[in-house]
Amino acid sequence: MKKLFALLLCALLVFSCAGLGLAEIDEALIKAAQEEGELVVYGSCEEPYLAAAAKHFEELYGIKTYYQRLSTGEVQAKITEENGNPSGDVWFGGTTDPYNESAKAGLLMAYEAKNAADLASDMYRDADGYWYGIYKGILGFMVNTEELERLGLEAPQGWDDLLKPEYQGLIWMSNPNTAGTAKLIINTMVQLKGHDEAMKYFVELDKNIAQYTKSGSGPSKKVGIGECVIGIGFLHDGIAQILSGYDNIALIIPSEGTSFEIGATAIFEGCVHENAAKLWIEYALSPECVELADDAESYQFLVINSAQQPAAVEPFGLDPNNVIDYDFEDAKNNTTQYVTDFFNALGDAADSRFKTE
């Protein structure tokens, strides 16, 4: 009787998923995942979206789903320390530079996902199946217009403007020790300026930085209240703050050009619940998962063909394709070295602002 009930439940779930628009998932995978019974998700997207996705996955498949919100740098440090015996099963959200470093270190498991066929482009997946993209975010500036007016300052329009002495102590960005966003910023400047000029740039920029935040979204959360006057980060985080009531925030795409993140999901090598992890990847690549972001006030551009883009983003006029031709291979191969070079360039300026707990 129990066996019959389990088979009926699997069949019902497959039928339900097909009705929702999810691609047909192997019944054997669903059954194996349910037998494992649990899944542990480390999420580097914003927590409301992470919580919504974990809850929905649990409701769909009857698999107890635990989650913890950590920055990409924190996840990377954790799985590096665990060295093939991870306490988590999957990674969800956050920019791909730390994913690539982790894959290179043998800490991610390759998996060929069926639902990857619905990705808008092959650029939104790792060629070997170590990670898959779920959203895209544009890098830029968020500024407090009231504070700039009070100080008698114009808003910066490009990367080089951030070096002006009048912005000393007004700029926040994230910490390369803990945030994938900061690694993307470093890679972006290397690709725009060349390696040596980029390192010189960061030495000058550091003179104007008041704080390096643990999370990439950290600056955006302090712009509206004026604690941060100029924040470097993803513009969708700024949109979330504007829509929450901070109409004193303006969004700026740097005039010299900018890059973008691909927010990803992946399986940890050596995870305990491997089948549940594979099922999560299939789920994460569905419109039913990625469209939860809109209701959770995460306004990234979605990279799933059949997914509906968040309507709240349209009035801001952001073009997801108005970005540089970001060299993902260079970032994949050299991010670790570039971060080391960043700290070496700063020298004694790499002070307590970069400390991690």
What are these regions (language model features)?
Residues G137, Y201-D206, Y212-T213, G245-C271:
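Periplasmic-binding protein-like
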Residues S259, G263-Y326:
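Mature extracytoplasmic/periplasmic domains
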Residues M1-E36, S352-E357:
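Short, low-complexity disordered leader/linker segments with a strong preference
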